[in-house]
Amino acid sequence: MIKNECEKDNQLAARLAKLAGYEKVNGFYKFVNTPEKEMENLGGLLKIVKNLFPDSEEQLLSEYFLELDPNKKCARQSVEYSDINQWDTLTDKIIINLCNSKNSTSQEWGKVYSLHRKLNKNEISLNDAIRESGKCKIKSAEMLFFSNAMLMYAYLNIGEFGLMKSTSKLLEFDDLPEGFIKESFKSRVSMLEANISLNENSLLEARQHSNRAIENSNVNRICFFAYLTIGNTLIFEDYDEAKKAYIKGQKYAKNPVHQEMLDGALCFLSNIWKKENQWVNYNSDNIKYLQLRAFYYINQGNIEEATEILDELSSRDQDENELGFYYYYKGLISQDKTDYYKSIRYFKKSDDKYFIQLPLLQLERMGADLELLNLISI
């Protein structure tokens, strides 16, 4: 398809060659005219596909990735691009190809990404993943790096931000060869570090990490979460700037899950600032979106509807962070300091130093002692 496009436009080949990193257009022509020829650095091909076929990227790359020789570098790079995009079905197929290859490095990549996928699907525990990666006797710099980085996602899922931070210190970018994989790993780690900073209420750092992720990546998923995080850091500070960041993220919300998350962020922002709210999710049974709906009803003065939702949630298995929000919303209805103190307790248990501001601000408005509030928020 790239060859066909170049035949339509004589100047296109030169532009694409430059985009893909070729010093001379002849090298690019050799690639497009030789079906079995693979680019040494997958990043060049990705830029071309995004430039020419932005709406067909997943379909075209899925077909191409599965045709790659699993013994070669390009196939190993393809598993990273597929995984970072969360093209899970494709990723699993590439992993099988790598594991069944004759190349020991490809086999190693297949094993490590297989562990990463099993962790994501909760098919193995963190301890099992650490033990199994140790058995792999990893030799490549890329997989030594990724076998640690993948643990940070698992720690994020269970709210272990301290372990995320200590693991991030094990990551050595200087050991990685220059090219697509290094840049992709940089964008991954930047977003993980942004999550750590947001949790620690280090908002400027969180924005810096997020902007760095955007600079290092053209992956929709990474850019989406980067703008989402930037917006989250601005929730209490500036309604317009937070909304602007979320709207920028809209461009990268390419699947229903991301769109739902974005709508949830806009809903929460509108609730906090008591603005007109067109993002309330009236259909989801997810705890987060039920809580947001209750928050909206509270703002509307529809206490009966809000109470009904919170009563329903009282019998649900909410995690500690969700309980922090739950008791905050209960406090908005009851105006009972006890609910706000419970909210603080659960936000502290979940190590959330950012959203703990919600009950603290309410208690301050109710005349609670500032020194006491500062003490209990530590």
From Swiss-Prot:
The keyword Transcription applies. It holds the Pfam family AimR. Keywords: Activator, Latency-replication decision, Transcription, Transcription regulation. Disruption phenotype: Knockdown results in decreased AimX transcription and increased lysogeny. It comes from the Viruses. Transcriptional regulator which is part of the latency-replication switch system that decides at the onset of infection whether to replicate and lyse the host or to lysogenize (latency) and keep the host viable. Activates the transcription of the aimX locus. Transcriptional activation of aimX seems to lead to the productive viral replication (lytic cycle), aimX possibly acting as a regulatory non-coding RNA. This is AimR transcriptional regulator.
